[in-house]
C-alpha cells in the first residue's frame, strides 16, 4: 500500500532546490507517493490555515493561525541579506513613505497579507 503525502511549496528557487531530488525521482521513497502542490506563498498560507496539506511551506506570520502543524527542523528559508526588500523611486525615507501611505498617495506591493514580508513591513513602518 502506498502512502500519499501532499507537500506544498512555491516555485521559488529555494523551494525548488529542497524538492528537486524528490520531484525528479533522484531519491527513492518506498511506499510513499509525494503529491507536489506548487502555489504562491499566500495561497499556501491559506491552505495551511485550512489544514489542506500534510506538509507545506508557510510564512512565519501565517503559522500562528494554523492548527495541527509543527515546524520542521529543516527547510527554512529566511536569513540576513535575504528579502524582504523595500525599494522606491526617488529619494524617500521611511517617514516619507509612511506619510504618503496615510494620504493614499503611495502603493506598496506585497506577496500577501499573511506573509512575513507584509508583517515586517508593517512593523518597520510603525
Regions found by a protein language model. Name each.
Residues 4-24, 84-126:
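Bilobed "Venus flytrap"/periplasmic-binding protein-like clamshell domains
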Residues 76-77, 81-85:
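Polyanion/phosphate-binding surface patch
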Amino acid at each position: 500500500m502506498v502512502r500519499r503525502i501532499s507537500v506544498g511549496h512555491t516555485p521559488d528557487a529555494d523551494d525548488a532546490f529542497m524538492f528537486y531530488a524528490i520531484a525528479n525521482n533522484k531519491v527513492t521513497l518506498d511506499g510513499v507517493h509525494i503529491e507536489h502542490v506548487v502555489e504562491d506563498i499566500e495561497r499556501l498560507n491559506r491552505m495551511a490555515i485550512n489544514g489542506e496539506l500534510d506538509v507545506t511551506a508557510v510564512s512565519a506570520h501565517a503559522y500562528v493561525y494554523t492548527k495541527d502543524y509543527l515546524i520542521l527542523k529543516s527547510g527554512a528559508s529566511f536569513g540576513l541579506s535575504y528579502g524582504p526588500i523595500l525599494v522606491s523611486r526617488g529619494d524617500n525615507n521611511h517617514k516619507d513613505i509612511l506619510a504618503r501611505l496615510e494620504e493614499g498617495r503611495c502603493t506598496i506591493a506585497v506577496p500577501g497579507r499573511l506573509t512575513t514580508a507584509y508583517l515586517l513591513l508593517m512593523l518597520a513602518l510603525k
